[in-house]
Amino acid sequence: MGQKINPLGFRLGTTQNHHSFWFAQPKNYSEGLQEDKKIRNCIKNYIQKNRKKGSNRKMESDSSSEVITHIEIQKEIDTIHVIIHIGFPNLLKKKGAIEELEKDLQKEVNSVNQRLNIAIEKVKEPYRQPNILAEYIAFQLKNRVSFRKAMKKAIELTKKADIKGIKIQIAGRLAGKEIARAECIKKGRLPLQTIRAKIDYCCYPIRTIYGVLGVKIWIFVEEE
C-alpha cells in the first residue's frame, strides 16, 4: 500500500524553508506555536472580512484578489516581524489598513512589551502559487462552472508562469453525484520522489451545495 507524504515537509530544509523563525525555552515552545497560529488566523480573517464583494467583476481578478500564499513570522526580544506574502495586495495598500491590522494583531500577542512590524511582499508570479490557483478553482466551482473546465482554466493560467509541471486533483461529490470520486488532470513533469525538485503543494477545501470538495495542487517549479 502506497504511503503518501506531504511534499512540503518532505523537502523542508532543502528546497522548502520554515515560515517561523524564533527560539524559545521548551516550556514556552507551545505558547509560541499558539501565538503564531493566532497571528496567521487573525491576518487571514482580516483579509476575508474586508475582501471586496462584487459579482460583476472578472473571475480572474475576484478569485485571485488578496490571496495569501504564506506568512513569515520572525521573533526578536522586543519585536515581532510579520511578512505577508500575497498575490495582489490591493486591500492592504489602502490607507489605514496596516494600522488597523496591527491593532487586531496586538491583541493576539502574548507579551505587551513586544511591538509588531508588518511588511507586505507581493508575489512576483501569482499563478505560480498553488494557493492562488486553488482559490481560483473554488471561485469557479461556487459559480456552477464544470469542475473539468475549472481545472483546465487553472492550468491555462499557469502558462503565464515559468513552471515545469502541474497536477490538480478534485475529490468529493463531483457534479452533485451521490457517489464521491476523485478526478485529476496533469501536465508536464512532477518528480515527487526527487528531493532536490522544488515542488509547491496546496490542499484546499471548497464548500458547495452538494458538500465539501477537496482540491489538491502540486506544482513543479524547478530542480535545484
UniProtKB/Swiss-Prot annotation:
One of its GO terms (molecular function) is structural constituent of ribosome. It comes from the Eukaryota. GO terms for biological process: translation. This is Small ribosomal subunit protein uS3c. CDD domains: KH-II_30S_S3. It is found in: Plastid, Chloroplast. Residues 43-124 form the KH type-2 domain. Keywords: Chloroplast, Plastid, Ribonucleoprotein, Ribosomal protein, RNA-binding, rRNA-binding. The keyword Flavoprotein does not apply. InterPro entries: KH_dom-like_a/b, KH_sf_prok-type, Ribosomal_S3_C_sf, Ribosomal_uS3_bac-typ, Ribosomal_uS3_C, Ribosomal_uS3_CS. Part of the 30S ribosomal subunit. Belongs to the universal ribosomal protein uS3 family.
